């Protein structure tokens, strides 16, 4: 079966799509966000008005899949355009003994072909805010994100100081302003923590789901918090006046995590993100797709993929035809930018 590069049909529709002006690009990559965990995908009680807004103002691609059912290999694929096995990355980066046991490196090789570096070389200001996990905070000598073609960053699951998980949009908006003042297009990896454990809950948001049991309310509040920050980002683009010049993508690294049946609600601690609720509050759903995080079934790798670019990408469209893989992203962007094209395992059309 032939994989199409996402938006390939749009390129044929819009000759001279970019002209002399390159769009800004924001890639929102959630963590463990299930395909069914969106209002626009029919969830019965989750509130995701801002992601739903992206869907109503853009195209919702239903046949997108990532390259792994877990974090680090999935992120490797979107950054390199290669399947993660090429780099012997088949699980999440952990501490050194664990990586050695699995014959994994301790971090992604910074010399790999990288989306951020291609964009940087094409004149983009590049930034990364949120989860990293192309190394690990338990490996203090691992390369920082700046070694990967990234101009500015705030991150966790990396060496050095750990960014507070809810500061992603707070840090991204000033970067957008600075890039605009410099007259440079920008690319932002906004790799959100939600809804990975630990769940860090705002009590005011949890109170909006008082009709639910505690675990469901915690999960719903966690996703609402992420959606609210996405709304702040979209409103910021509106206020600055660059909405029409900005491609915004929302997706997830893999499907939702689920604990064993009757997993008790309890607190758990993560060295990068701190204290919060554990798998007892993991209530993500896949919209009927089989299996969950960690699986190569559709529930583990079939994730949301919504793209908005006003005037360029059709609004309010649901695409159930185009088959898209995460490894298609790098060659698509590189091809659009007319940079030196790399050899990848993906195909262009």
What are these regions (language model features)?
Residues 17-349:
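Formylglycine-dependent sulfatase
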Residues 3-18:
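Sec-dependent N-terminal signal peptides of Gram-negative exported proteins
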Residues 1-2, 25:
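N-terminal export leaders
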